[in-house]
Amino acid sequence: KTLKRVFRKNSHDPEFLYFLKHQDPFQPHRLPKAWISAMAKWITQIENHSGSPFPINVIQGDVDGTLDWQYNIELLDKKFANMTLAMIRGAGHHMVNEREDLREKIFAAIKL
């Protein structure tokens, strides 16, 4: 059992979006219901996780329409006391496949 996948505009790079939808052999056009069940299970696991004192660096685009990033940021902030957040104005979900000006900001936010 599968569901039809909807490809959203989640990057500002039109060539990448075309590739993703029409040429990438690793992008399914139908999603197994088991994948959706696995995602729901993962959400429950992260919500029930006790958290961690380890520092994490979250890089998030403010036009990401693929996931509920506002909810995720709030949840991660509660779970990880040492979280730093870099919000990238105008960036979507596929951050490394964004326009060059956005990628520069994204890569500058990476802290090793």
Question: Where on the chain are the PLM-derived regions?
Answer:
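Acidic catalytic loop of the alpha/beta-hydrolase fold
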Residues: Q27-P28, V63-L67
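Alpha-helical elements of Rossmann-like donor-binding domains used by nucleotide-donor carbohydrate transfer enzymes
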Residues: A38, Y71-E74, K105, A109
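Active-site nucleophile elbow and catalytic-triad environment of alpha/beta-hydrolase enzymes
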Residues: R30-H49, F54
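Alpha/beta-hydrolase-fold enzymes
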Residues: K1-L31
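Short beta-strand/loop motif that positions the catalytic acidic residue
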Residues: S52, V58-D64
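Catalytic active-site module of serine/aspartate enzymes centered on a nucleophile-bearing elbow/loop
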Residues: N82-L112
